[in-house]
Every structure is written in C-alpha cells, then in structure tokens.
Amino acid sequence: IEIDPASVHSVEILKGPASLMYGSDAMAGVLIFHSAPTLAKGDMRANFSTGYQTNNGLFDYSLNFAGNQGGFVWNTRYSGKMAHAYKNKYDGYVFGSSLREQALSQLLGWNYRQGHSHLTLDYYHLTPGIVEGERDEKTGELEIPDGYDAKSYGKPMPYQQIHHYKAVLDNSWFLGDGNLKLLLGYQQNRRQEFEEEENPKECGLDFMLHTVNYDLHYLSPEMNGWKFSTGINGMWQQSINKGSEFLIPAYHLFDYGVFATVSKKIGKLNLSGGIRYDHRHLHSKALREEDDTDSHRSDWNGFVLNGSESNGSELNDSFRFQAFKRSFEGVTGSIGLAYEILPDFNIKLNLARGFRAPNISELASNGVHEGTQRYELGNTSLKPENSWQFDLGLDYSSPIISAELSLFANRINHYIYSEKLADENNQPVLIDDTPAYQFTSGDARILGGEASIDIHPVERLHFGNTFSYVNSVQLHQSSESKYLPFTPAPRWVSDVRYEFVCDGKTFDHLFVKLQMDCNLRQNHYFAANETETATPSYTLLNMYAGTDVKLHGKRLLSLYLSGENLTNRAYQNHLSRLKYLDVNQVTGRRGVYNMGRNFCIKVVVPIEL
C-alpha cells in the first residue's frame, strides 16, 4: 500500500450498510486510513519524529507542519526511511530484504461556513529489494554476490522501484442540514524491476497504471429519526507495459456503482440498510512477441503491442497475451441493527450480500512474479465472487472489565485463489524454470471471529487477551483441496500493561507493557500439488515502554522503546510467501524465516510556533 505510515492519524473498519459506498472490492468490509483533521482557526503546529531499529538498521524520520489561518488550511509532511537486510537465527542476513522509502504530502484548502475544499498532493517512492532465497547446495547458506555488505543501505540486484503520485480534491458543502460531498482523484503508479548487473539502469518489468476516481454522494438531514444517503462512485484505469518482461497485459477499465442507504433510530435500537448496483467493463489488450514474419516490425525491446480486438483465430504462440473484453455486474445489499441491551452492553447484527469482480491479475497473468518463486497464469473464464455474510458483535464495558466478541459466517460462490500446477506424474509444472500457479475458483464457507477481554482491577493495571480464529473450507472437494490457501493460523495475544506515572511533573503517561504473541500450528492448508504446507506454532515475547517528558509543565518530547521477538525465535508466518523458497539441503528447512530479535527506539518532538 503506497501510504506513508507517519501520515495515518487513525484507522477505521467499516462493515454493514456503510461499506456499500465503496464498491465491489469491499465485499468483506472496508479499511480506511484517516489523515489528521485540519486544525482550528489560528492554530499552527509542527512536530518531528525519528526512530531506529537494531535488527535491520532501520532509520526513519518525519517532519510535519500544519495550520489554519483565517480558514486557509495546510498540512505538509516529509518522511524518509531506509533499512539494510534483516537477520534471523537460521538464515543470518537475508539478501534482498533492504529498502528505502520517501514520502511527501501537501494539503492545501479552505474551510468556510458552508463546507470545505481541500486539495491533497502526495508523492511516494519505495525501493524494496527482492528476496529470491537461492541457496548454495553444499553449505545451505543464502547465495550473495561477491563483496556484498549485509549492512549496506544500497540497492543490490534485484530490486523494485515504485513511484506513486496522487492528487485528491475533496469538497463538502452543507445544504441546509444535509451534506453534499464530491471527491475527485488521480493516481499514477509506476512499478519497475531491475535485475541485470550488466545493465543496472535497464528494467525488465515496467508498467504504469493511471487511475481516476470519482465519488459524489448526498447525506440527508435527520427526519423523525431517519437518515438517507445516496450517491455514485467508481473509477477509470489504464495500465501500460513499458518493459521487456511482462506479468499482466496492458488494459483499460471503467466501473461505476450507485448506492442508497437508510438508517433509523428507535430509542435504544438503531436500524440500517442499503443497496448497491455495480458495473465494470474491462478491455485487455494483446501483446505479441515479434517474429520475422510480422509486418509491424519494431525495435522496441523486441515486442510489438496490438490493441485491436481479435476473435482468437489468428492468434498463435507468438502472442504473450490475447485481447479480450469482459463485463461484470452485481447487486449487493446489507441490513443491520445495533441495540443497547444495557447501558454497558450492546449487540450488533448484520446480514450482507457481497460481490467482487475478478481483477486483471486473476484473469490474465502470464509471467514470473518475482520474489514469490511463482509463474502466474490467469484464467479469463473466472466468474465474479458472490457471497452471503452474517456478522454478530457483542461488547461490554465496566470499570473493571471490557470485552468484545465478533463472529462471522461467510458463504462465497466462485471464490478465487491460485493453485500450483502438476503434470500427469504429479511433478510440478515449470515455466521458465519456475513453478507454475494458475488462478481458479470454487465455492467456499468461511467461519471465524475474534474475542478480546481487558481486565483492569485498578486504573493503572490492564490484563489484555485477544484470540482470533478463521476456518475456511472449500465445499465438495477432496481432503487435499478442502481448505483454502492463505488462511491465517489461530492466534492468541496476551499482554499486561501498567502505567507508573499519571500527570507527573517530569514524566507523564509512563507505561510498560509485556506481550506474548502465540500463533498456533496451522494444519488447515491447501495441500493439492503441494501448493501449501503446514506451519508450526511459535510464540513471540515482546516488551514496550513509553513516556511523555515534560519541562515547566509542557511536553518536551515523547519517547517509546520496544523489544520484539526477545527470545530470537526463528519462525515463519503461515501467510508468508518466503516459506516456499529454496530448501536448505544441509538442514532440510525450506524457505526464508522472519525477522529475529529487534529493539526499537522512537522519539516524537513537538515544535512550538
């Protein structure tokens, strides 16, 4: 996600009718990253933050300046980050795991009595390495080039380079007691992969994605407890291949969705509902590898693009991608309620019908996905996913105990996933010496939930426990294909937190937290053709501390310390693609392991203006 973490003020999770405003990709809900709200009139603030991590030498910094003078508002932020290769107990330093990141954001706007108009300009530049996990057969160690310095902040081959530009115009107007919002956005994302030592400035994969987003919706004033909202939103996209290697075809896409939601408050009961219609049209272009008989000869990297439509009869093996058009449409809806059973005890229920159109990677991939050791193949016959989901939420709060329970049951038709291919001898299919995976679909049932409890017998002491579980089953399949791939393992997180000083003269909000992060063994995996393997359980011990430092009654700085994976446990997360890289022939262990012990320090300094 091309987002500067330092710019995120809060994170919101939307489910139920409210998520209908966000289109087909919001089938399971919406995760919204909110930036900081604009300041009050006459206020100006600045701050500087910096941090360091010992495991991979990660150094980051961020400078922010915001203000509001007579309704003219601004918010400027510049952030940077760099890290060398991380290390763990089994692999040592992991070649290709270094990164560099830069981000610049500028908000300019005007707040007035009838609403606001804000223009946000963002630039994000990420240069991550690519972990290939190739090993020396004799020693079992990860292969590294001669003269490689594991603590270098440079860019060892291979690596990616991502440039992301974004402009968003956010308008809001009050119409009586109602509200009209118009949002227009443009994004340009260019992703390049560099892998040739002989030609370090020439990239293999190079594609550029243009996206235009639009959103217009109206929220009515409350009338006898009723609220209505209606609108239209969608996007236009164009993707262009500029390199000599390819993963997905060039394409353009247009979609739109119209929606309406309603809510009603009746005493302690809140009712809500909504409906949405989505339509998406995708036009994927052909790409043909040039041969001597081609009349459209080109010296451009040995390839020529053909954007014309074809019925497929004249296509032959020289075509990397075949042109096709697909249209998808679906109707979604949701009904929900929230009821205050007791002043401290609430219940939420929601039933939703979901829809998701397959994306271009799932439909038309045909190339090596670097860093995953996969040759990915799309499937143009895929159908949209359709689902029914039921959610139940309970929450209770008292001076001593706070508890939440969230359960869900999801039935998805045509659930899309990728499967490793095997030949008639049950041996992996290799394309360009890389295992081949193809997108397919099936009917799925997904059950799960999360339970959390926080016990605070005294104000300063907290005992927290959270347990999450997901069971995802593919219906009417053999035992090897029963469980869906990339299902997270059951997880239990337990912590104890104590605040030593509250409103102290020198130290304020001083706290220490000890945490145990226990990930249970995942035996529910997609075993067909060895697409996945079981993942052993592991437990991580972490420690966190923080305080505000004050001088003459004013906050001078905030200091945060942490130690993660204190026991230096070697582990692999079940969702990590790195666990399927090369086998260590000496130890028999497969893949690359996650980061080992890591200590962090972070300082945030407010600047008075």
Q: What name fits each language-model region?
A:
Residues 1-3, 13, 25-49, 61-63:
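N-terminal periplasmic accessory domains that precede
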Residues 50-56, 69, 80-84, 112-114, ...:
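Transmembrane beta-strands of outer-membrane beta-barrel pores
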Residues 56-82, 92-131, 159-176, 222-223, ...:
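Transmembrane beta-barrel wall of Gram-negative outer-membrane proteins
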Residues 83-85, 95-97, 101, 115-176, ...:
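Flexible loop and strand-edge segments within Gram-negative outer membrane beta-barrel domains
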Residues 223-229, 233-235, 243-412:
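Structural signature of Gram-negative outer-membrane beta-barrels, strongest in the C-terminal barrel
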Residues 408-411, 429-522:
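Gram-negative outer-membrane beta-barrel transporters
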